[in-house]
Amino acid sequence: GDFQHTPGDYVYINCREISIIEWYPFNIFSETAEGDLILHISSNDKWSKKLYDKTLSVIEKDNSLDWEIRLDGPYGGSSKAILETQHAILVGAGFGISRFAPILQDISLQLGKNLNSTPLKKIDLHWIIEDHSYFEWFTKLLHRMKDESGFFNYHIYFIDKTPDAFNEKLMYMSTNATDKKIDVSIIDNLWDAASFHLPSWNEKLSESKDRNVDLNSKVFYSGPRKHLKPLKKSCKRLNIPLITKKF
């Protein structure tokens, strides 16, 4: 139809079965060939947890939903600013990582096609994980984007876990609520990119900048305010532009 959106956009949704008056913003993850929107909804607050619980209870009974969802948007945040940056340093923390997922998915689809027509030459992603709500669905995308060319690199920081909490290799687990199936697969190379503490931004950004000295770098941040101050300080010290949320 007339619904136009770009990667990184979000919509507000209202579900009368949950609340008549409340509207909540959710990131657009992708759109199917039939025109259905796939949104990233995390059950980490009262409204979205209610939505999650009610959806599961309905599916368990008769495997169908007949709810009317009202939608307002889209609003952006598009991927344009990232695609127009030669060296994009993405920093996602907590729920903020979901902002980058559709953008990275879009870039992933363009890899090998017409990405050469954009200024973007290199992506460094820094992912700060405070809980594992977003780990399952994001790891496969990282695995798919990692290639030999060095175009895309990622660094993962578990700040709620110790190395002892993991086996030697990290597992990807996907759950299909409708079929009640669980698929588990091993992802080898995530382990090499993982740390168990907050990064030293002076060190990480200096390394990143030195490796890409011929490219103009920008940092894009999405996540809680508590992680922003040290990042902002390092960006200022190293003279790297910092863009938060509005991109």
Predicted regions and their residues:
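FAD-binding FR-type
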Residues: 2-90, 105, 175, 246
